């Protein structure tokens, strides 16, 4: 089978399954968040937590709940890592160092799963499921809750800014969506050979004749939510390139589908909740255009042959698993960087300059193609407001979106939400490059303008883009175990996650306080091909104006060498 045919069949299968799941999954999630009934287990949780499930919260009450819950989660995870040595199933592992524990706690609570440690030799089989896997569920549920709160801002009329109840949204997202879906995915992965074990490991003899210790862990259960919740942190160091996590081409497709399922179907949920499904289809079309374009660039770049090794192999196979090949690796890479997942089944640092630049650009677009669980929906909705504002300026009318006027307050909050990520990426990269002491941690270096120094810059840019977008993938040539990277990337993960959430919730409250205005002949249509083009152009223009100089110094310069 030719590589082109293999790529086409895999892409067609993924798109076909997503198309089949789009309506039922999207409508199911809409029913979950709009239901007035609580499950029995939910009622028990509310009673134990003294939560009034019928009480509504204003945006600042909702935001305070998000921040309070996330802070408590981070503290719990931090101290769990620090006392790991006295916990069950520690297998001789001591407590995690303060810097790594801090970075990891922020990383998993922020849905980033950036890993500056080797999982097999750092985290025990107790901390993995009790600490990290739990955060994989609840951090994803937090993102979904914030997205639904913003949607309520559009559909509620003069409600005093009430946008729902965070604790109810968190509980329903975890128990009704993430848990059952993860269970099904875990069973499928188990059938493909993904392991599920609490044994410490086993010894074997390698091909070179030396003894090898193979780590075992409860992988299947965590692998499912790792992908479904767009978390991405591997329970094994090689992540989804490891045969214990992703053993077959079919398991690879299942993991790609798990990554894309909820972000794609949330556009249907949005359309259903606002009462106009064309709105959701328009957002989905924009996501699809961006995702398809970057996938085409990545496939073309990786299928070419550049350099002696690539020419001999016929394609850029360095850093890729033979069982997946170019199509499975490129499809996974674009899926994982277009969402906030960050899981990898190949070495992104070994990709061609244009291929690596494409997955980097996928993050720099704001991870909206299709975006993370919840974060993708509220990210593209904020950009839709900017597009409507630009359209309103062109025709000289007050911009409106779904019957809500976009005044100074709304546009200011939308702009602030968009500006957080670029500021963190560019400032963090600039400071790191200026600091001469950090150059020793780059796997590539040299005099300015040489290929090594250019790729070294790309590694730093990728790291801060990944942390600030809560992605978690990396160009592995950069060593990030120093105190500078542990602290700076931790701050980027923290601010990149929670500052946009605060601005989005404030925006939801402002919208929910308004009355709806009836559309007129001069109202800009926000569904259909015209708005699809306007929104796509806005996304590309914002990213191009912001990041083109940095990309020109990194991937583009390397591609032109």
From Swiss-Prot:
Record's signal peptide: none
Compartments, record wording: Cell membrane
InterPro entries to which the protein is assigned, alphabetical: KdpA
Disulphide bond pairs: none
Sorted UniProt keywords: Cell membrane, Ion transport, Membrane, Potassium, Potassium transport, Transmembrane, Transmembrane helix, Transport
One GO CC term on file: plasma membrane
Transmembrane segments: 5-25, 60-80, 86-106, 130-150, 177-197, 247-267, 281-301, 324-344, 376-396, 415-435, 491-511, 533-553
UniProt GO molecular function: P-type potassium transmembrane transporter activity; potassium ion binding
One Pfam family from the record: KdpA
Membrane topology designation: Multi-pass membrane protein
Assembly information from the UniProt record: The system is composed of three essential subunits: KdpA, KdpB and KdpC.
Purpose of the protein: Part of the high-affinity ATP-driven potassium transport (or Kdp) system, which catalyzes the hydrolysis of ATP coupled with the electrogenic transport of potassium into the cytoplasm. This subunit binds the extracellular potassium ions and delivers the ions to the membrane domain of KdpB through an intramembrane tunnel.
Family statement: Belongs to the KdpA family.
Protein's UniProt name: Potassium-transporting ATPase potassium-binding subunit
Organism this protein belongs to: Rhodococcus erythropolis (strain PR4 / NBRC 100887)
Gene designation per UniProt: kdpA
């Amino acid at each position: 089978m030719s590589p082109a045919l293999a790529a086409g069949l895999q892409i067609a299968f993924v798109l076909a399954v997503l198309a089949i799941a789009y309506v039922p999954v999207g409508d199911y999630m809409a029913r979950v968040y709009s239901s007035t009934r609580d499950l029995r287990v939910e009622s028990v949780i509310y009673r134990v937590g003294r939560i009034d499930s019928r009480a509504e919260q204003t945006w600042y009450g909702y935001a305070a709940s998000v921040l309070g819950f996330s802070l408590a989660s981070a503290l719990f995870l931090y101290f769990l890592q620090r006392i790991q040595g006295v916990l069950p199933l520690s297998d001789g592992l001591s407590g995690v160092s303060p810097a790594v524990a801090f970075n990891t706690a922020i990383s998993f609570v922020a849905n980033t799963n950036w890993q500056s440690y080797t999982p097999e030799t750092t985290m025990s089989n107790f901390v993995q499921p009790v600490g990290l896997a739990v955060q994989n569920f609840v951090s994803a549920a937090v993102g979904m809750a914030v997205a639904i709160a913003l949607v309520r801002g559009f559909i509620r009329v003069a409600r005093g800014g009430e946008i729902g109840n965070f604790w109810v949204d968190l509980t329903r997202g975890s128990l009704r969506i993430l848990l059952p879906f993860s269970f099904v995915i875990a069973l499928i992965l188990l059938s493909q050979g993904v392991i599920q074990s609490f044994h410490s490991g086993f010894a074997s003899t390698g091909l070179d004749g030396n003894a090898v210790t193979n780590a075992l862990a409860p992988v299947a259960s965590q692998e499912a939510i790792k992908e479904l919740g767009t978390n991405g942190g591997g329970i094994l160091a090689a992540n989804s390139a490891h045969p214990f996590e992703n053993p077959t081409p079919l398991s690879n497709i299942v993991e790609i589908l798990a990554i894309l399922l909820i972000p794609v179907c949330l556009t249907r949920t949005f359309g259903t909740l606002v009462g106009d499904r064309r709105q959701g289809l328009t957002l989905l079309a924009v996501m699809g255009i961006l995702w398809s374009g970057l996938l085409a660039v990545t496939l073309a770049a990786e299928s070419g042959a550049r350099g002696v090794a690539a020419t001999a192999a016929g394609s850029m196979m360095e850093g890729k698993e033979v069982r997946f090949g170019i199509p499975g690796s490129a499809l996974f890479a674009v899926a994982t960087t277009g969402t906030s997942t960050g899981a990898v089944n190949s070495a992104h640092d070994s990709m061609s300059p244009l291929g690596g630049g494409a997955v980097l650009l996928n993050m720099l677009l704001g991870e909206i193609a299709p975006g993370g669980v919840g974060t993708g929906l509220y990210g593209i909705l904020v950009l839709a407001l900017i597009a409507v504002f630009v359209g309103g300026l062109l025709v000289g009318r007050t911009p409106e979106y779904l019957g809500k006027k976009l005044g100074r307050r709304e546009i200011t909050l939308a702009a602030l939400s968009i500006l957080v990520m670029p500021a963190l990426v560019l400032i963090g990269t600039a400071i790191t490059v200026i600091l001469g002491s950090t150059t020793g941690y780059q796997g590539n270096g040299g005099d300015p303008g040489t290929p090594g120094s250019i790729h070294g810059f790309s590694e730093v840019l990728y790291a801060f883009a990944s942390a600030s977008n809560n992605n978690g993938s990396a160009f592995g040539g950069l060593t990030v175990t120093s105190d500078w990277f542990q602290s700076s990337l931790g701050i980027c993960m923290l601010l990149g996650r929670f500052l946009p959430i605060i601005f989005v919730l404030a925006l939801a409250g402002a919208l929910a306080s308004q009355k709806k205005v009836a559309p007129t002949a001069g109202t800009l249509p926000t569904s259909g091909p015209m708005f699809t083009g306007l929104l796509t152009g806005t996304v590309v223009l914002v990213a191009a104006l912001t990041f083109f100089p940095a990309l020109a110094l990194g991937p583009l310069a390397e591609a032109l060498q």
